[in-house]
A protein has these predicted regions:
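N-terminal pre-Walker A segment at the start of P-loop NTPase domains
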Residues: 1-13
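ATP/adenylate-binding site constellation spanning eukaryotic-like Ser/Thr protein kinases
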Residues: 9, 22, 48
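Phosphate-binding P-loop
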Residues: 14-20
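Hydrophobic anchor at the beta1->P-loop junction of P-loop NTPases
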Residues: 25
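The conserved Walker
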Residues: 29
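Conserved lysine of the Walker
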Residues: 33
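Conserved P-loop NTP-binding catalytic core
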Residues: 38-95
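Electropositive, glycine-dotted interaction segments
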Residues: 82-208
Length: 208
């Protein structure tokens, strides 16, 4: 993903942002950092066709509209990958979102892939080959929350170096086992991780 456009979502009335491989958000409390990150979780739930459940468990439709549904009547988003894109528009239905538009595009050409359902069509759509790239990306979106680094942090929990090595848990419970697996199986990748950290924290030497 190299560009994202969001309209009407939470604290974002109209946002257009070019993305790099690594993006750092800096701002005061309430400036929208958490809302921006939450949009990627929103995207993943949308792709997995679990948007209705996700919205219901996170405060209902009104919580997702910019300044509420009395001010905003639609959430629109476009995510771009070089010369291809995926876009959608959500409006309020009967206590749930309705897709008023869902499209795949290539340069200036676009194809409607679904409308007026409560869940996205992108996961099951197979009409365009460009959809496969976008599906793969959306399916792999994960939110990791590593805010708590105190004594009771998930980082301090024990993890099994065999059973907990396959993917990183959302709160970092298995960070040690996950990094150990990378160190043992793909040392080049492990060293790259260390060097990236050192690029912003030169005093860091290693994880052990």
């Amino acid at each position: 993903m190299d560009r994202i456009e969001i309209k009407g979502y939470k604290s974002f009335k109209d946002l257009a942002l070019d993305l790099l491989p690594i993006n750092i958000l800096i701002g005061s409390n309430g400036s929208g950092k958490s809302n921006f990150l939450s949009f990627f979780e929103f995207l993943n739930r949308l792709y997995e066709q679990k948007l209705t459940e996700y919205v219901a468990l996170n405060g209902g439709i009104d919580k997702f509209f910019f300044q509420g549904s009395k001010i905003t009547d639609a959430i629109c988003a476009t995510i771009g990958f070089k010369d291809i894109f995926y876009s959608f528009e959500l409006k309020e239905g009967d206590n749930r979102f309705v897709f008023s538009k869902e499209e795949l595009g290539n340069n200036s050409l676009y194809t409607a892939i679904g409308a007026f359902g409560n869940e996205a069509s992108i996961k099951s759509y197979s009409g365009l080959s460009i959809g496969e790239h976008i599906r793969r990306y959306l399916s792999e979106i994960k939110k990791y929350h590593f805010h708590d680094t105190g004594k009771t942090s998930p980082f301090t929990k024990e993890s099994h170096i065999q059973n907990d090595r396959y993917y990183l848990y959302e709160k970092g419970d298995n960070l040690a086992a996950f990094l150990y697996a990378i160190h043992e199986e793909t040392p080049i990748v492990y060293n790259r991780i260390v060097k990236v950290i050192q690029s912003i924290a030169p005093y860091f030497s290693d994880f052990y």
